[in-house]
From Swiss-Prot:
Its EC number is 7.1.1.-. The gene is ndhF. The lineage of its organism: Eukaryota, Viridiplantae, Streptophyta, Embryophyta, Tracheophyta. NDH shuttles electrons from NAD(P)H:plastoquinone, via FMN and iron-sulfur (Fe-S) centers, to quinones in the photosynthetic chain and possibly in a chloroplast respiratory chain. The immediate electron acceptor for the enzyme in this species is believed to be plastoquinone. Couples the redox reaction to proton translocation, and thus conserves the redox energy in a proton gradient. One of its GO terms (cellular component) is chloroplast thylakoid membrane. NDH is composed of at least 16 different subunits, 5 of which are encoded in the nucleus. It is found in: Plastid, Chloroplast thylakoid membrane. GO terms for biological process: ATP synthesis coupled electron transport; electron transport coupled proton transport. Belongs to the complex I subunit 5 family. It is a multi-pass membrane protein. This is NAD(P)H-quinone oxidoreductase subunit 5, chloroplastic. It comes from Vicia faba (Broad bean). Its main location: plastid. Keywords: Chloroplast, Membrane, NAD, NADP, Plastid, Plastoquinone, Quinone, Thylakoid, Translocase, Transmembrane, Transmembrane helix, Transport.
Length: 746
């Protein structure tokens, strides 16, 4: 065991040779390296597998011994200054290392197929390997300086991958937005680190916690200054984990390749913020106002993320807002002091969300066979539907991930989310009501995604309803940029929707198919395929297809994780049988809500607690099915249902309210617009004023002196022309002026 801990310093550096060797290969042997580019997937996966085995071994030892191992190297610069670097191995490090490596391996396997067509394949694997290195360095850091260094490296890799297709302006803008937003949080984190170093004189976690606790108990520090420093530390996590109000970068980050979206949302970028709060929780718990602030930010993010997800038409942005909401649950749990529940949900959510993103990548891949490379179309759920028979394995995997995130037993997220909801009742009934209501909303928008994508009919075949020809494929440049100029075309989805490509979709999926269409689906497609009215007589229709085995393998492994990973946190203890592996791993742990009670609960208590949360989730599923499942269109044909709709009082007012809520959700709560007006526009005006001030005043003074000297010189050169008469004339003129001046002012 001692040898394993002593060798743990190498964990972050094991994946590092891959980006180094790729860089050297491109420098020395560019042609051979590019021709053999697919071979680099193997060393990337192999080295990360070694780290995973190492991490599992550390976790087993942690369960058996509950030990904390820290090793520090000190570099003394002078008598007053020394730098210390080291690594810390504890329960949090073990959990995060397993999470990073398992998800990372599956994403790399998936990416080998997903990115095989992309000429940036080598660049992608270079970034991914360095991303894993940076995240592993972050979780093994023993002090705040190392945390900040690897924190910035994690951010840098995220920006590179978000803007991976940098020739697309929207991807470049998304990268810039993520960078600028995170600069706010990272600047706060740096100030917080400096503030606590000034207070305690140490940056090592254990020393920092002990010194700070003693200072607080002895009342030897200014509580306002301490609270400000803690708030600044928390700002870093707010930005990195996309918490309100620094969440605006996360949906735009979906412009990167889908595999990196899975890694960012499951185990790296956004998980880093939760990790930092969990690591610094011993520091925060001695400041009650900070804990309350963390819980408040968490519950606001829970609600905001869920409400903004209900009207999105882009499948990846929908999942991004889902991630934002689930991270809010984790932050809420940490703010309540429920350390175990937060980390439990971090684990279960990581595998479920990775499964959903890889599933969405499979869907996007299959849609590209129809629409070509066009993210506005291949990620648009309005154009999907009926993918069940075309991609059955993807459908099954996506459904399992959806049910897990909805909180349906026995899938992973049910166990962790139920624990957070139960703890919220102990913390604040108001927070509990909000959290439980949002759980139902989560079930609604997640099942909405599933129904829009897999149920009904394939809507993309109806996009030529206006009778104009439109090729199914687009000309793609090197980085996926469309060569063809986009046209705004109206899409009529057979009574389902009339919209422009750039406009919103309907909040409810109100399909009104004709009687013939409802009776015979095959006749619909024959009708559309044969009709010359749609301008598609000579154009073949393509259908979505199932992904290849490499991509499906990663998804199926994540399905197994989604089924069974929740069992590690089952807190039942019946007749001497203790199934709670997570509690053993998290010793010592922090739990402010169960200080005087046992962690385990009996089956009856669990059943009572779970019934309520599961009922809310099923209610959300039912509402989503009612509005989005194709059977809803049949209900509209019933006279009783139509009569009910016509006789509902004030239906027009209710429709207006629904449209207002829809617009609010679709436009991201107008938060981006608010930042655009209040911050970006103000900064631009200030920049223009500074530009004017600099050019007209700062530069105007030396420029004015130079110009005046030029004109004076031009005037003087006519005086000294070599004529004696000119000299006498100017001499007499100046003499008379002097005399006149003396006469006026004696």
């Amino acid at each position: 065991m001692e040898y394993t801990h002593q060798s743990s310093w190498i964990i972050p550096f094991i994946p590092l040779p891959v980006p180094i060797l790729i860089g050297v290969g491109l420098l020395l042997f560019p042609t051979a390296t590019k021709n053999l580019r697919r071979m680099w997937a193997f060393p990337s996966i192999f080295l990360l597998t070694i780290v995973m085995i190492f991490s599992i071994d550390l976790s087993i030892q942690q369960i058996e011994n509950s030990s904390i191992y820290q090793y520090v190297w000190s570099w003394t610069i002078n008598n007053d200054l020394s730098l210390e670097f080291g690594y810390l191995i504890d329960s949090l490090t073990s959990i995060m290392s397993i999470l990073i490596t398992t998800v990372g391996i599956l994403v790399l396997i998936y990416s080998d197929s997903y990115m095989s067509h992309d000429q940036g394949y080598l660049r992608f694997f270079t970034y991914m390997s360095f991303f894993n290195t940076s995240m592993l360095g972050l979780v093994t850091s023993s002090n705040l300086i190392q945390v900040y260094i690897f924190w910035e490296l994690v951010g840098m890799c995220s920006y590179l991958l978000i803007g991976f297709w940098f020739t697309r302006p929207i991807a470049a803008n998304a990268c810039q937005k993520a960078f600028v937003t995170n600069r706010v949080g990272d600047f706060g984190l740096l100030l917080g680190i400096l503030g606590f170093y000034w207070i305690t004189g140490s940056l090592e976690f254990r020393d920092l916690f002990q010194i700070f606790k003693n200072l607080i108990y002895k009342n030897e520090v200014n509580i306002l200054f301490v609270t400000l420093c803690a708030l600044l530390l928390f700002c870093g996590s707010v930005a990195k984990s996309a918490q309100f109000p620094l969440h605006v970068w996360l949906p735009d980050a979906m412009e990167g390749p889908t595999p990196i979206s899975a890694l960012i949302h499951a185990a790296t970028m956004v998980a880093a913020g939760i990790f930092l709060v969990a690591r610094l929780l011993p520091l925060f718990i001695v400041i009650p106002s900070i804990m309350s602030g963390i819980a408040l930010i968490g519950i606001i993010t829970v609600v905001l993320g869920a409400t903004l997800a209900i009207a999105q038409k882009d499948i990846k942005k929908n999942l991004a807002y889902s991630t934002m909401s689930q991270l809010g649950y984790m932050m809420l749990a940490l703010g309540m002091g429920s350390y175990r529940a937060a980390l439990f949900h971090l684990i279960t959510h990581a595998y479920s969300k990775a499964l959903l993103f890889l599933g969405s990548g499979s869907i996007i891949h299959s849609m590209e066979a129809i629409v070509g490379y066009s993210p506005d179309k291949s990620q648009n759920m309005v154009l999907m539907g009926g993918l069940t028979k075309h991609a059955p394995i993807t459908k099954m995997s996506f459904l399992i991930g959806t049910l897990s995130l909805c909180g349906i037993p026995p899938f992973a997220c049910f166990w962790s989310k139920d624990e957070i909801l139960n703890d919220s009742w102990l913390y604040s009934p108001i927070f509990a009501i909000i959290a439980c209501s949002t759980a139902g909303l989560t079930a609604f928008y997640m099942f909405r995604i599933y129904l829009l994508v897999f149920e009904g009919y394939l809507n993309v075949h109806f996009q030529n309803f206006n009778g104009k020809k439109n090729s199914s494929f687009y000309s793609i440049s090197l980085w996926g940029k469309e060569e063809k100029k986009k046209l705004k075309k109206k899409i009529h989805l057979l009574g389902f929707l009339t919209m422009n490509n750039n406009e919103r979709t309907s909040f409810f999926r109100e399909r009104t198919y004709s009687h013939r269409i409802n009776r015979n689906v095959k006749s619909i497609r024959r009708l559309f395929l044969d009709s010359t009215h749609f301008g598609t007589k000579n154009l073949p229709f393509f259908y979505p297809h199932e992904s290849d085995n490499t991509m499906l393998f990663s998804m199926l492994v994540l399905v197994l994780f989604t089924f069974f990973v929740g069992s590690i946190g089952i807190s039942f203890s019946q007749e001497g049988i203790d199934l709670d592996i997570l509690s053993k791993l998290l010793i010592p742990s922090i739990d402010l809500l169960h200080q005087n009670s046992k962690n385990s609960v009996d089956w009856y208590e669990f059943f009572i607690n779970a019934t309520f949360s599961v009922s809310i989730a099923f209610f959300g599923l039912f509402i989503a099915s009612f509005f989005y499942k194709p059977v809803f269109s049949s209900l509209q044909n019933l006279n009783l249902f139509n009569l009910f709709q016509k006789n509902v009082p004030k239906k027009i007012i209710s429709d207006k309210i629904i449209n207002i809520l829809y617009d609010w959700s679709y436009n991201r709560g107008y938060i981006d617009a608010f930042f655009e007006v209040s911050l970006i526009a103000s900064v631009r005006k200030l920049a223009k004023f500074n530009y004017f001030f600099d050019r007209q005043l700062i530069d105007g003074i030396p420029n004015g002196v130079g110009i005046s000297n030029f004109f004076i010189g031009e005037a003087i050169k006519y005086v000294g022309g070599g004529r004696i008469s000119s000299y006498i004339f100017f001499f007499v003129l100046i003499f008379l002026l002097i005399c006149y001046y003396i006469y006026l002012f004696p």
